[in-house]
Amino acid sequence: MRNGVRGIGGLEAERLQACIPLAVDCSRTRLYGCGCSGVSGLLRRMVLSASRGRAIALGNHIFLPDRHDGDLAILAHELTHCGQYQAWGPVRYFARGALEQLRHLFYRKLGLGSNPYHYHAKAGRPFTSYGMEQQAQMVEDSFRSRQQGQVIPSA
């Protein structure tokens, strides 16, 4: 760990990767959480301010607000975005991400369209056919409900 920035590895990575139906190279990810200092801390504060205090993944960099420290379901959601970034590349990832956030803004502020995080899981429908935020929300929900035996569709 350097200046509060750390990688995701060991048992944590195994547990998270087990619930994400996308390939994610955790060794390429960096987590900016509680305890970030120096330039990393400044970067974390700026990103979290711009995201209105919401957890966010920018490429392979995950920024978590203090209230989500230790919340593996939120981390699984954001790690899903890292997997999307790794699979799609930066142009497609950031273009789709910007579009999803605009859709969410229109839905939240104006009541237009549908919530890009909301999904209806259908048997036989592949995981990759869902939207960017739907995929991440499915992983988060699945992680939270694993004790009840619910699973998400395979890739």
Predicted regions and their residues:
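Metalloprotease/metallohydrolase-associated module, dominated by Zn2+-dependent proteases
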Residues: 5-34, 38-45, 50-53, 93-155
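Catalytic Zn2+-binding segment of zinc metalloproteases
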Residues: 67, 79-98
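A short, surface-exposed helix-loop junction/capping segment
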Residues: 1-2
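Short pre-active-site segment immediately N-terminal to the catalytic Zn-binding motif
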Residues: 47-76, 86, 124-128
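Short, solvent-exposed loop/turn segments at secondary-structure junctions
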Residues: 34-38, 62, 69-70, 80, ...
